[in-house]
Amino acid sequence: MMEEIDNNELKFRMITPDGESFLVNSAPIEGWQNDIWKTFDEQKRVFDAEIKKAFEHCNVPLEETIERAELVVDKDDNTVLTIDKLPVLILYKPEFLYSKGKAVQRYKRLYEEDVE
């Protein structure tokens, strides 16, 4: 719940299940969207770098990526980069650690594993 006071400053109030209310510090709330977008941008840069490494390792020139590479979603909702229909990189679905207030994103470089 927000209250507007005379100087156009917003005050945030928490309401408990029993109906009591109290003021809360709005600082952690302000700018939360910027934090989320910054995190998405950082993750995108990591993914872009990992995809580029996979292309380089598999000797796929940039002009051939559209024909040879594909991003697919597996049965567990993970994103998989395939090159020539073979999986080379798994970007796992994010794990949300609510108690720590963060998400963990993992990936696996299949192209580095020995394939027999």
Swiss-Prot record:
<protein>
    <recommendedName>
        <fullName>SPbeta prophage-derived uncharacterized protein YoqA</fullName>
    </recommendedName>
</protein>
